[in-house]
């Protein structure tokens, strides 16, 4: 029994905690939704305007419900949409997405005007191929080739 298991006994899969979403701020919500839904193929789960807080949120996922893991796109109304985006600081790295056809996906994204930062390549012979792209707000997204040979992306 691992040390973590001694402290975290959750029982069945349904009782286990799960990562639900990660939030990023975007300068233009419509532009971000075009990128994540039209170009990456994610599903729009919900979109809500919160007038009291002066912001809008949208949840996108490759699944069909919130529990499949999502990205929350948040637009603060007082942030000028003519700015390129928010400062990401030095702490944010990237979001990683498993892609069955990495080369084909990168070709489609590039044809759609998406910036490819790192073309598909393997960092180690035993690791899956990966690529990096940038979303419209400058966030890095790692695309990892998924297959039966590499069941855990990134390892």
Task: Describe the residue ranges of each PLM region.
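Vicinal oxygen chelate
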Residues: 1-15, 56-59, 97, 103-155
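Short N-terminal helix-initiation segments at or just after the protein's N-terminus
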Residues: 2-9, 20-23, 34-45, 76-83, ...
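Short, low-complexity disordered segments enriched in Ser/Pro/Gly and basic
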Residues: 13-16, 88-90
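Core segments of cupin and vicinal oxygen chelate
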Residues: 14-17, 23-68, 111
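Eukaryotic phosphotyrosine signaling hubs
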Residues: 19-21, 90-95
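Residue-level signal for secondary-structure boundary sites
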Residues: 30, 68, 81, 103-105, ...
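Conserved short beta-strand elements that form part of the metal-binding/catalytic scaffold
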Residues: 43-87, 133-136, 140-147
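Short, electropositive, low-hydrophobicity segments enriched in small/polar residues
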Residues: 67, 93-100
């Amino acid at each position: 029994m691992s040390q973590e298991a001694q402290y975290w006994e959750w029982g069945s899969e349904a009782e286990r905690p799960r990562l639900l979403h990660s939030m990023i701020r975007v300068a233009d919500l419509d532009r971000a939704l075009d990128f994540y839904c039209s170009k990456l193929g994610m599903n729009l789960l919900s979109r809500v305007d919160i007038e009291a807080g002066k912001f809008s949120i949208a949840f996108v996922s490759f699944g069909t419900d919130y529990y499949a893991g999502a990205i929350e796109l948040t637009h603060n109304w007082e942030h000028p949409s003519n700015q390129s985006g928010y400062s990401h600081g030095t702490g944010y790295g990237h979001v990683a997405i498993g892609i069955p056809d990495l080369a084909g996906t990168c070709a489609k994204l590039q044809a759609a005007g998406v910036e490819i930062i790192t073309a598909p390549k393997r960092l180690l012979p035993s690791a899956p191929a990966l690529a990096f792209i940038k979303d419209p707000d400058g966030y890095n997204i790692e695309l990892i080739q998924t297959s039966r040979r590499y069941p855990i992306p990134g390892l």
